[in-house]
Amino acid sequence: MREALARLAAEGFVEQRAQRGMRVPELNFEELQDLSTTRQIVESETIRLAALLGDHAWRDSVIASFALYERDIREHGERAVDWKTTEPRHHQFHKAVVSGCPFPTLRGICDSIHQRLTRYRLQLDAYRFGTDEVIGEHRLLMEPVLSGNGDRAHAAARSHFGLSLSILEAELQFRPALESARPGKRPRP
């Protein structure tokens, strides 16, 4: 148990408090901006390299993971995507996209950042987009990646991650007001 908690603490999922055990850290703007900016830098470059260096088998895996993700979205939602249900396929799609990069350390960093940002996505329930918008946004990322044009893929990735950041920031900003408006909840001093 201690080893598992130590690993979660090292990855930023829990924090240790002196003489008080562990707790899940609060969501905050600084961490969100740090993770998102790091993702824009690291994953966009990883995607650029994947677009330039990925082979036919990699392209096939990106297409297949996108098809599975699209199918899951269409099966689980009509007006708004249920991220709690579709997140595994979403993660699989992003892993497939970066898997064309031949550098495992870069891919590992991308995966770690994605997992930490998933905590924000799921806790904030921030993405209230319809199925067509979500599918379209990921298609806009996939197409330049598959074209082999590293610069276009890099730009598409930065745009994709920038949109995600702006949505999460807006939700995080309004979260305290939403929490205090719930029945039976008192506003925090």
Q: Where do the model's predicted regions map?
A:
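Short linear motifs at protein or domain termini
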Residues: 2-52, 165, 169-189
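Short hydrophobic/aromatic segments of transmembrane alpha-helices and their interfaces
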Residues: 5, 14-16, 88-90, 134-135
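Alpha-helix N-cap/N′ positions at the starts of helices
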Residues: 19, 42, 64, 133-136
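Conserved amphipathic alpha-helical segments that form helical-bundle/coiled-coil interaction surfaces
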Residues: 30, 47, 52, 56-123, ...
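Solvent-exposed loop and edge beta-strand segments that line ligand/cofactor-binding
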Residues: 126-130
